[in-house]
Amino acid sequence: MIVTVFRSRLRPGVREEYVALADRMNELARTMPGYISHKGFFAEDGERVTVVEFEHEEGMRAWRMNPEHRDAQKLARERYYDAYSVQICEVKRQNSFQRE
């Protein structure tokens, strides 16, 4: 499994407009081969974190290179982000617990 951790800080006053773009990108991500899930969080200090999971690197790469996603990335750099970072990780081990 490939996990992408995307951390960003938005410019003042753009959150509502940005969320509309992010919602569209989330819809698009779901159509990519090997897509598993994604979740986004806003922290109190203004940082936004999105975690995206793909079954394999090919799916993540297809997502990264998708033309609509590339256009959205460019727009976000120009208009919405003060800063961002991306970490791509391969899961070496996974553990979980669910109380019934």
Which residues does each predicted region cover?
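Cytochrome P450 substrate-recognition site 1
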Residues: 78
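Short S/T/G/P-rich N-terminal loop/turn motif that feeds into the first structured element of a domain
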Residues: 1-48, 55-67, 81-100
